[in-house]
């Protein structure tokens, strides 16, 4: 079975709490024994995971210079979800909120969107197989544990998946600069999917045409667009605000 590295306290802790069987071995900074790390090391030992102490330089090299917070783990690659898993996930939510990312290829942006999605109670993130950042250590680290919690579904044909979900009552709201009304005028209270495109390019034509509604985020300054992770946070939490107000 293929394996991968994860690094950082949040990412390692999230996998340890939910899928401890994925751990192969762990590497920790030699001599570090603080209150944040020791409980994780104790749990790893209980699970029978081999722990190696390493110098900072060795850990830095393994993490390719990224901020590992003194811990790296080699784990089995998690099961990749696809369109066949969507129905089971939706069945767990009375009024599902989904996030669709069309063409978000930067791992930092994907990780930040996962973190937003977890905070907003998103049921799943849907991405196209051929136009999305891979799930890797960078995504997991930026997501601060959300990558191990929020289902990430990779689909072969995004527009077809959207149409299938529309038939099940999901309303698709896409973000586009050319939209005629803004997010604060849109109704975001029912079963909903918010669709975000890539920075610069936006959504692909077929994705945009498949959306039920197009909205924009009002911009008062000189910049014309926002980072996709910032924009997704704004949209998701406007949906959260409306849903809480409707209760």
From Swiss-Prot:
Q: Give the catalytic activity.
A: guanosine(2251) in 23S rRNA + S-adenosyl-L-methionine = 2'-O-methylguanosine(2251) in 23S rRNA + S-adenosyl-L-homocysteine + H(+)
- In terms of superkingdom, the source organism counts as Bacteria
Work out whether the entry's keyword set contains Thylakoid: no
UniProt main location, coarse = cytoplasm
Record's GO cellular component terms: cytosol
GO molecular-function term, one example from the UniProt record:
RNA binding
Entry's localization field: Cytoplasm
Pfam families, from UniProt? SpoU_methylase, SpoU_sub_bind
Question: Is Phosphoprotein one of the keywords?
Answer: no
Q: Which family does it belong to?
A: Belongs to the class IV-like SAM-binding methyltransferase superfamily. RNA methyltransferase TrmH family. RlmB subfamily.
What NCBIfam families does this protein's entry cite? PRK11181.1, rRNA_methyl_3
- Primary role: Specifically methylates the ribose of guanosine 2251 in 23S rRNA.
Which protein, by its recorded name, is this?
23S rRNA (guanosine-2'-O-)-methyltransferase RlmB
Organism of origin? Vibrio parahaemolyticus serotype O3:K6 (strain RIMD 2210633)
What is this organism's lineage? Bacteria, Pseudomonadati, Pseudomonadota, Gammaproteobacteria, Vibrionales
Q: Which gene encodes it?
A: rlmB
